[in-house]
């Protein structure tokens, strides 16, 4: 299930940071996630935090 969710969310990541930087985004600590990587949050319980973050920024949300 999580690989399906990540595959869907990866489309947003590529749209936001570009294909060349997508993997780095997934593996870099992020202040929005208390310095955890987005990959660390791709669990059944917390993957929606990553989804919500990406959707917010995809629709032009600020910081």
Where are these regions (language model features)?
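Non-transmembrane "mature" sequence context
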Residues: 1-63
């Amino acid at each position: 299930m999580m690989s399906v969710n990540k595959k869907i969310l990866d489309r947003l990541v590529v749209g936001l940071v570009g294909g060349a930087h997508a993997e780095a985004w997934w593996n870099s600590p992020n202040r929005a996630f208390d310095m955890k990587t987005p990959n660390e949050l791709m669990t059944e319980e917390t993957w929606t935090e990553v989804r919500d973050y990406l959707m917010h920024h995809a629709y032009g949300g600020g910081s």
